[in-house]
Amino acid sequence: MTETSMRAGNIDVYGFLEPQSIQRSGQSQFESENYIKNWMQNSKRDVYLGAYLNGAHWQMVVILPKENVVIWFCSLHNKPDNYLKGIINRSVLFFNIFALALVSALKGLDDTQQSKSKTPARWIVVKCNRQKGSTECGYYVMHWMSTIILENFKNNWEMYFIDARPLEPERLKALRIQWAKYYLKVKNET
């Protein structure tokens, strides 16, 4: 996805969360939160996209920390689990409190406005494509990610994602071919 973002000319807009760093297995909540907080602070992107593996099902989260908004995508139309909501809410809260404190310190202001930054992130569950089968969830996540990047989406999520119909078989086939080619390219480079 980083290459797609580079080709689209918006690499400075989109950041990507490493799936293994936000999963429930193998990471503590503290480690996952630290990873997200550090990545948002250091990379300074507007939008962060993350593939999240919940059990055996891939889902997607889009974080807009400056807007205090999180967008949720699930091809089974499940709600986000409490683990993910917790680590993201705390990470976004920290990001906003830190950013406001930094601005206040630089401007010599008091931090009375910090109470505004303490509101939890607003979660938007979009009406996204619903998968028919049981194994194509990862392709749905890749479809949504590439759509967001190539169309340069940063707001009005409910206007863009309004179609609950499954992806067309031709689109799924194209995604499979695209990612198989990419995998082979990376494999041959190593």
Where are the model-predicted features located?
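Predominantly extracellular/luminal regions of secreted and cell-surface proteins
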Residues: M1-S5
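Cysteine protease-like catalytic core of ubiquitin/ubiquitin-like
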Residues: R7-T190
